[in-house]
Design a protein with these regions (language model features):
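Conserved short beta-strand edge segments in small beta-sheet-based binding/regulatory domains
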Residues: 56, 119, 123-144
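Cytosolic-side membrane-insertion boundary helix
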Residues: 132-175, 179, 307, 593-619
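Extended, compositionally biased intrinsically disordered regions at domain boundaries
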Residues: 2-62
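Hydrophobic alpha-helical transmembrane segments
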Residues: 165-387, 392, 398, 409, ...
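Short acidic amphipathic segments
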Residues: 50-52, 57, 61-111, 123, ...
């Protein structure tokens, strides 16, 4: 026999062959045993702070993950991190956002490197840990950055495991292989179905790790007990979650340049106007506790625990019923198998699956429209929202308008001169706002700096020579402001912050709050959440039992931070409200779409909870009827587990259809709120043309009209503030107080 070998390679002798054969054995001996592996795995799961720090950066903006005390230590720890970064040359802006669990930094890449920022954060963390005497500090919380790939990777692995388990279960069922008793999954079911046990495990290893661990255990049990119906529902849920995560990452990728370009900017174009986090605050103070954890009074600094929704109520009741039925089966029937099957029958699988499918589909559709999910868990709380707080600044447009004037001539003159004024430019008392010929508009407030966009507006004096007349400047309403308030009314109670410029639509709100004062404080500091006006209002509503959704731009950042669901508007040229859960664009139509999902979310959860209770009741009944001595068979398995699986599948389909229907609605036509009675004919035509895009030139000079798919705007007259009659000068001859609206 001829041995084939490469040239120059000698054939191994017996000694070499023996050593080669013994090598795998020595390697196996060097590997840790199962017990050591289990201890190491437990150590890694319970100390997630040992994994590498997550960092995202692009074009002069960086989001750096915080670890330990730097993240959970409250305002003082957050201030230490941001102050250390601000001291670096080239850093324009730095602020900790506990919603993301990161410090957000705007910097000049030519002066400072990202590695320098990370090193500075690490130095502060080590100093804080040394002061606290806690070693490496507390473990990380569970928040995820939308650009991270870890959640998508974890869900993909879980999908692969569930799919493999489904194949094993289906193959075993077809070839009639022996299966493990269905009751073998009772232990996993007890941990998964008992809210307290699940919460204790989540506190130990984190909510995301808990979901994965229980998912893997359920897949393993489903494969051994040959339950492809259960695994099929799990696979569909994983697919929906993966689609949601991928859509969210793509949405952030599309808008990253736009969002990070404005990260270091002030809230207004005028350098004299402090932005969020500046001397006049308004970005909201971080609480001692962040957004970590699924519930409880410490979650987001809530004054009381988050109220239970239909899914939580059904889960708690079924958990108690499952333990009671399992105990009865064990004591009365003296059958561990019967007890385990009764526990499995009480699993709230349909309730969770229905809400999860609705939330995942809603997140995917919103992300496809450019809405960035900074914290997608808020979509799982949409079914509990019963109060919507709208910050009036989010409803404003981009043009200055006259709210009131001494007489009609003053109104017309001021309206003409204010046409190109930036509504967020601030003025000192006596400063000239605009000038035209011999007429000047002068700021007439008492002290400080004021803007037309401020809640009380900008008082003006119209001076022509020695003659002066008074006027009040405000901001036009966004065309979809009324649609947002009407959509909010469909969610429950509507709370609106008081603002002179939104008085026309304030009647759509149930409660009008006075504008929150802007507290004075040291530069670089941020107001405490308890001291911040809007955040305090949110906490008062929460203490009264409400689940609050806040709609705001960057001026309501502290309210977004305290809200149960925060919907933020990222206006062009201004810093995005990173404290929001859902980051919309500059159009209110995005907010309208988010609010449209809330009533169907509540209805879907109620329907899923009803299906879950009904399926569990039927499954428990069939289990009792079959008795502990029934022989295992396909028919018996279908009778025992079929109702729960059928209820879960129905809930999944219901959630999917409900979310798609909620997303399908057409955007309403914009409504134009204008003081038509106070305008001249030429001014009215100009205003209408600017708002609708219509051509106001003479008919002979207009091009041929082209068809458009955009809805025509509705026209409404601006109403005076409630309780205040307009001065006679605001009404032209024969004008009515409120003009009728033209249809679309």
């Amino acid at each position: 026999m001829v041995a084939l070998r490469p040239p120059g390679l000698p054939l191994p002798g017996r000694a070499n062959l023996a050593r080669a054969l013994a090598a795998p054995v020595s390697v196996a001996r060097a590997l840790p045993g199962p017990g050591r592996l289990a201890r190491a795995l437990r150590h890694e799961l319970t100390h997630p702070d040992r994994r590498p720090r997550r960092i995202w950066h692009e074009d002069g903006a960086a989001h750096i993950e915080l670890i330990g005390v730097a993240r959970t230590g409250g305002p003082s720890a957050h201030a230490a991190v941001s102050d250390a970064l601000r001291r670096l040359a080239g850093v324009d802006w730095a602020e900790v956002d506990e919603g993301l669990g990161r410090v957000l930094v705007g910097f000049d890449g030519d002066q400072v490197e990202v590695s320098d920022l990370v090193d500075t954060v690490g130095d502060v963390e080590r100093a804080l840990h040394a002061e606290e005497g806690q070693g490496p500090g507390p473990a990380r919380l569970a928040e995820r950055h939308p650009a991270e790939a870890d959640p998508l990777l974890a869900e993909t692995i879980a999908l692969a495991v569930d799919t493999a388990a489904f194949g094993v279960a289906l193959t075993g069922r077809f070839v009639r292989l022996p299966s493990a008793p269905r009751a073998a999954g009772a232990i996993v079911a007890v941990v998964d179905g008992q809210p307290r046990l699940r919460a204790a495990l989540a506190d130990r290893i984190g909510p995301a790790t808990t979901d994965l661990a229980l998912g893997f255990a359920s897949a393993w049990v489903g494969a051994l007990t040959q339950q492809p119906d259960v695994l099929a529902v799990a696979v569909v849920g994983r697919l929906a979650r993966i689609a949601e995560l991928r859509a969210g990452a793509l949405a952030f990728g599309r808008r990253a340049t736009e969002l990070t370009a404005d990260t270091g900017r002030r809230s207004g174009p005028d350098d004299g106007q402090p932005g969020p986090g500046g001397p006049d605050g308004g970005s909201g103070g971080p609480p001692g506790a962040g957004r970590g954890g699924p519930g409880g009074a410490a979650w987001r600094g809530r004054p009381v625990p988050l109220p239970d929704g239909p899914v939580e109520v059904a889960s708690a009741r079924l958990a108690a019923a499952g333990l009671a039925l399992g105990g009865a089966g064990l004591v009365v029937g003296r059958s561990p198998r019967l007890a385990g099957e009764l526990v499995l029958a009480a699993l709230p699988r349909a309730a969770r699956a229905g809400r999860e499918m609705f939330a995942a589909t809603a997140g995917r559709r919103l992300a496809a429209r450019g809405i960035v999910p900074l914290d997608a868990r808020c979509l799982r709380r949409l079914d509990r929202v019963d109060t919507v707080m709208v910050c009036a600044s989010a409803l404003l447009g981009e043009r200055v308008r006259v709210l009131s004037a001494t007489d009609a001539q003053t109104w017309d003159r001021a309206e003409t001169m204010l046409g190109h004024l930036d509504p967020r430019r601030s003025f000192r008392p006596g400063e000239v706002v605009a000038r035209a010929g011999g007429t000047r508009l002068v700021a007439a407030h008492d002290a400080g700096r004021r803007r037309a966009a401020d809640p009380a507006g900008l008082p003006l004096l119209v001076r022509t020579g020695s003659v002066s007349a008074g006027a009040l400047a405000g901001v036009t309403l966004d065309g979809h402001a009324e649609a947002v308030l009407r959509a909010a009314r469909g969610c429950g109670r509507v709370v609106l912050t008081e603002h002179a410029s939104v008085a026309d639509i304030a009647g759509l709100a149930d409660v009008t709050l006075p504008p929150a004062p802007r507290p004075r404080q040291a530069a670089g500091a941020r107001p405490s959440r308890r001291e911040a006006g809007l955040a305090a209002q949110v906490h008062r509503l929460q203490a009264a039992g409400a689940v609050v959704c806040v709609v705001a731009d960057e001026e309501g950042d502290e309210a977004l931070r305290a809200a149960d669901v925060g919907v933020g508007l990222a206006r062009a040229g201004r810093r995005p409200p990173w404290s929001a859960d859902l980051l919309c664009g500059s159009e209110l139509t995005d907010v309208w779409r988010v609010l449209r999902f809330m009533p169907p979310a509540a209805a879907t959860s109620r329907r899923a909870a009803t299906l879950s209770v009904s399926g569990s009741a039927l499954a428990a009944l069939t289990t009792f009827v079959n008795g502990p001595g029934a022989r295992p068979s396909a028919r018996r398995l279908a009778l025992v587990s079929g109702p729960v699986s059928a209820a879960a599948a129905t809930a999944v389909v219901t959630g999917l259809v409900a979310a798609l229907r909620a997303d399908r609605g057409a955007v309403p036509a914009p409504v134009l709120h204008t003081d038509w009675h106070a305008l001249t004919a030429e001014a009215a035509l100009r205003r209408l043309g600017a708002a609708t895009g219509a051509d106001t030139r003479p008919a002979g000079q207009r091009p041929t009209a082209q068809p458009t798919a955009q809805p025509a705007p509705r026209v409404a007259a601006a109403a005076p503030p409630r309780g205040r009659a307009p001065p006679p000068a605001q009404r032209g001859p024969g004008a009515r107080r409120v003009a009728p609206r033209a249809g679309p």
